[in-house]
UniProtKB/Swiss-Prot annotation:
UniProt GO BP: regulation of DNA-templated transcription
UniProt keyword annotation of ATP-binding present: no
Cellular-component GO terms for this entry: cytosol
Protein name per its UniProtKB record: Probable transcriptional regulatory protein Hac_0344
One Gene Ontology molecular-function label: DNA binding
Family: Belongs to the TACO1 family.
Location(s), subcellular: Cytoplasm
Length: 240
């Protein structure tokens, strides 16, 4: 996804924050991580990352603690599911969900697509090969400087931990690696004592497409409906 789409997503995330829409999504990630690996972030890297991402969005500590406790209750009966869809203008969509009711989730997603002319849900696996899965970490540039490291030093230090690409974006450093290197890269940051601002597993289109303003406006109507669904925790497209 290109910068135009990322700017739109950034604006959307700000609206989520104002409406407290983002907190339920973050809470689900915390609950599922705690359910899978236990409620101690010191021994559960997945939970540690989920908490890190929640703190990056200013999620209150009480909300985080409640989400961890929820893992041992009936409310913690969550599962991860992925759905794929197509829209007009060659747009491909992958939706990652966390839900306690997959039947409800797929019914809601189908309704968004059915109400959008030319859009449809497709069988899982139809589009996955058109996206590469990557580990993506963000840290602050000044945190790197505080460790007396240059960007070259950082790149060299993390290569053995699976780094494939390092990019400077404003006051942040973006680190990308293979999907399977997520745990290893996390260990690399810990070995350097470099604080992670945000960490995620992302899907990046192998052949991105460009849309004009009119096409983007029409496509956004569907994407906004998907993003606003509490069960959808990540949305990926092939839009440049």
């Amino acid at each position: 996804m290109g910068r135009a789409f990322e700017y739109r997503r950034a604006a959307k995330e700000k609206r989520w924050d104002k409406m407290s829409k983002v907190f339920p999504k973050l809470a689900k990630a915390i609950t599922l991580a705690a359910k899978d690996g236990g409620g101690d972030p010191d021994t559960n890297a997945k939970l540690r990352t989920a908490i890190l991402n929640a703190k990056a969005q200013n999620m209150p500590k009480d909300n985080i603690d409640a989400a961890i406790k929820r893992a041992s209750s009936k409310e913690g009966n969550l599962s991860e599911t992925t759905y794929e869809g197509k829209a007009n203008f060659g747009v491909l969509i992958i939706m990652e969900c966390m839900t306690d009711n997959p039947t409800r989730t797929v019914a809601n997603l189908k309704s968004y697509f059915n109400k959008t002319q030319g859009a449809s849900i497709v069988p899982n696996g139809s589009l996955e090969f058109m996206f590469n899965r990557k580990s993506v970490f963000e840290c602050l540039k000044n945190e790197v400087e505080n460790l007396k490291l240059s960007l070259e030093d950082l790149e060299f230090a993390l290569i053995d931990y699976g780094l494939e690409e390092l990019e400077e974006v404003g006051d942040k450093i973006i680190i990308r690696g293979d999907y399977n290197s997520f745990k290893l890269l996390n260990e690399g940051f810990e070995s350097l004592k470099l604080p992670i601002l945000k960490a995620s597993l992302q899907r990046i289109a192998t052949t991105p497409i460009e849309l004009n303003d009119e096409q983007m406006e029409l496509t956004e109507k569907l994407l906004d409906k998907i993003e606003d669904d509490d069960d959808v925790v990540a949305l990926y497209t092939n839009i440049e």
